[in-house]
Amino acid sequence: MFTNRKILKFLIFFFCFSIFSSIAQTNEDVPLNNMAINEIPKPISSLIFEDFFGNEIDLNDYHGKLVIINFWTTWCAPCKKEMPLLDSLYQDKNFKNLQAFAVNMEQPNKLKTKKFFTDLNIQKLEIFFDQNLNFVKEFKLRGVPTTVLINKKGEEFARIIGEVNFQDKKFSKWLLKYD
C-alpha cells in the first residue's frame, strides 16, 4: 500500500508538471500578456462601417490582407498613448499586406477626432466610425482600447484587450508571420 501511494504521488506530480509545462510553452508563443490567440480563427460576418467622410467601408473588401482594427475613444488615456505606435506600425515597410483601421467608438464628432489625430501627429492612419455599433455586436466589445487582428481569410485570429505597444519587437516579428 505504501508503494502504491508513492506511485500515485509520482503520477499526480508528473501529470501536474506536464500540464504546467504545456501552458508555459503556449504562453511563450503569445507576444503580449493581454493578447488572446484563437486556436481556431473565428469567421466574421460582413461588417459595414464609415470612414471620416461618411463613405461606407465593407470589411469583406479586405480579404487577402492582414487587418488590424483598433477601437478607441478620444477620452481614453491608453488609446492616446498607443495611437502613434499603431501609426508607426502601419507605416512599417516590412509589412506588405497590412491594413489598419482606427475605429472611434464615440458618437461621430469629426472636429474632436480630427484634433485628437492632429495633436498626436498621426500621419497614415485614418479615422473610422461605427455608428450602427456593428463592431460592438460582432466582436462583443466591452471596453477600449481593444484591438482585433484579422487574417487574410477574414477571420479573427487574435485580440488584444487594453493597451498595446505596437512597436514591441517581439510583437512585430510575430505579426509579420501573418502578413
Q: For each of these PLM feature ranges, what is it?
A:
Residues 44-45, 67, 144-145:
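Short loop/turn microsegments at loop-to-beta-strand junctions
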Residues 58-80, 86:
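Short active-site neighborhood of thiol/selenol oxidoreductases, capturing the structured segment around
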Residues 63-65, 95, 122-124, 141:
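Active-site acidic short loop of glycosyltransferases
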Residues 81-120, 131-138:
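Structural microenvironment flanking redox-active thiols in thiol-disulfide oxidoreductases
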Residues 1-46:
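N-terminal targeting signals for export/organelle localization
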